[in-house]
């Protein structure tokens, strides 16, 4: 038996909006410690990892580990029927091929039940090792979203370069080129507006902007985004979900032509 009650129902709606463009079908894994998802996008370029810890739910019951295959677009349609202030409960019986979403209005004068068929989805769990990164950038998520959106009007890729000067986002396309530099600034009274750069060594990597723009759909979940970069590893774009967990996006860098790689 599975029963999860989330007072901030809007949180689940935001999570779905953040990932459904990248991933069509995915398994939600429930265990005694939390509700999680790990899935590749259809082109196997990006990976999404979500964790909502059990402590963040008002009520969390998971008698045994359960994996529920869901079509995320169908799930998003159901969640759109919930009001932003509604309390959402997810229920599933052991061995059942359906999951029930229950939406309660805050005054509890209206309760709606939606039942959705589960799917059998073959998915392999990738072990994601904890790695040391050459550079870690923390910045306002709204700023990162704006930069990715602005650069998309010029080019298809973004070069993210971290040096002691700051973090630079660059692109070029048929109409020209653009560079946006963010320098470290720590706002004591407004930590959510700070840009903090931890650099072991300079790093410069190229990524597809369409994926970065897709990742920024998670901006509504967190005021800050953390971007972890290393030349040998996929970038990690992480949004913390207040007191509950995180959503992380992993994206392999684009390899430049050999000619361009020569110093």
UniProtKB/Swiss-Prot annotation:
One of its GO terms (cellular component) is PCNA complex. Residues 61-80 bind DNA. Pfam families: PCNA_C, PCNA_N. The keyword DNA-binding applies. Signal peptide: none annotated. One of its GO terms (molecular function) is DNA polymerase processivity factor activity. GO terms for biological process: leading strand elongation; mismatch repair; regulation of DNA replication; translesion synthesis. Keywords: DNA replication, DNA-binding, Nucleus. Its main location: nucleus. PROSITE patterns: PCNA_1, PCNA_2. Transmembrane segments: none annotated. InterPro entries: DNA_clamp_sf (IPR046938), Pr_cel_nuc_antig (IPR000730), Pr_cel_nuc_antig_C (IPR022649), Pr_cel_nuc_antig_CS (IPR022659), Pr_cel_nuc_antig_N (IPR022648). SUPFAM superfamilies: DNA clamp. It is found in: Nucleus. This protein is an auxiliary protein of DNA polymerase delta and is involved in the control of eukaryotic DNA replication by increasing the polymerase's processibility during elongation of the leading strand. NCBIfam families: pcna. Belongs to the PCNA family. This is Proliferating cell nuclear antigen.
